[in-house]
Amino acid sequence: MLLSAKFENIYSFNEETRILFTASKSDQLPLQVSRAEKRDDISVLRMGLIYGANASGKSNIIKCLAIIKEFALNGWSNLKYNYFKMTDEPQERSSIELEFKADNQFFAYGIAFSKGGLLEEWLYKTGSRNDTMIFERKRNGDSWDNTIAPQFLKNEDGQFLKFLIDGTPTKGTFLSEYIKRNGKGIDTIKSARKWFENLNIIFPNTHRTDFPFRVVNDTQFRTGCRSQLGMGNLFYVYWGR
């Protein structure tokens, strides 16, 4: 569940711009809000709709989501994008951060980057009262300053975690490297990474070959489609030769 997204110096976004899907305290439209049930929970909107004039930046929001997903899953791979250029002093440092809910936990994952590659990466566990760092990485010339929350370094996996984050390739992200190298000791990284794996981004030229199989095998997806489309049921029909 996406809670918010922040963009800075990328495409049509100059200064830090944030879009929120969290709910206000208003009770005028109660059916449109999923209210917090626990003290550290967050009330969110059941659905978000982005609208505006042509060329106002709507598509750029989706492009930014696709960029951070690519970073989270595969690291830097010579991604093509444009930083904000309609200024007298253009900067090359861009950043994207998403706040989301996964496995009943709230996270903030962000990256800062330039045309030359990744500059910063961070993952925090967030809540209604405070935020807790899981890890941070900052590029310092040709090296990296890496930090993992102390509680994860105390157990038997701590030494391997330090080795793993220090050995993350310059073009890689720790979020992806942790999974590739079978990292242990920080289950929250697995939850955050899984959220990005399940993040569906559909562009006009996207060919969704998995849709028929999800209709059959994913009960939650099928139920949601039926509810939104007003259909009695959905089936996968195979037309063989």
Question: Can you describe what each PLM-predicted range is?
Answer:
Residues S34, D41-S43, G48-L49, A53, ...:
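Conserved P-loop NTP-binding catalytic core
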Residues A5, L98-F100, R241:
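Short acidic-hydrophobic surface loop/beta-edge motif
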Residues N14, K69-A72, N233:
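Short amphipathic alpha-helical segments enriched in hydrophobics
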